[in-house]
Curated annotation (Swiss-Prot):
Gene behind this protein: rpsO
Family according to the record: Belongs to the universal ribosomal protein uS15 family.
Organism: Campylobacter fetus subsp. fetus (strain 82-40)
Matches recorded under SMART domains: Ribosomal_S15
Official protein name in the record: Small ribosomal subunit protein uS15
PANTHER family: RIBOSOMAL PROTEIN S15, BACTERIAL AND ORGANELLAR, SMALL RIBOSOMAL SUBUNIT PROTEIN US15M
Gene Ontology cellular component annotations, sorted alphabetically: cytosolic small ribosomal subunit
């Protein structure tokens, strides 16, 4: 379920704060969102793949923590990111 390097580089370039930025919360959330959507599609086909379901829950939890951090530190960037990714605000 890993992303190929070309797609990952495209996402990093789109959400990076500056050139070479791979660790900012915006980039991490965007990468996690892409992985979550791909894994969700996999689980719609393979309903009994419980180990992948557990991995999906871990990814969602990690994304939730990063979004909580981003909301506390930089609310403007948070609102822009969730609008661009199509994520609901709690």
């Amino acid at each position: 379920m890993a992303l190929d390097s070309a797609k990952k580089a495209e996402i990093v370039a789109k959400f990076a704060r500056k050139s070479g930025d791979t660790g900012s919360p915006e980039v991490q959330v965007a990468l996690l969102t892409t992985r979550i959507s791909e894994l969700t599609g996999h689980l719609k086909i393979n309903k009994k793949d419980f180990s992948s379901r557990l991995g999906l829950l871990k990814l969602v939890g990690r994304r939730k923590r990063l979004l909580k951090y981003l909301k506390a530190k930089n609310y403007e960037s948070y609102t822009k990111l969730i609008a661009e990714l199509g994520i609901r605000d709690k």
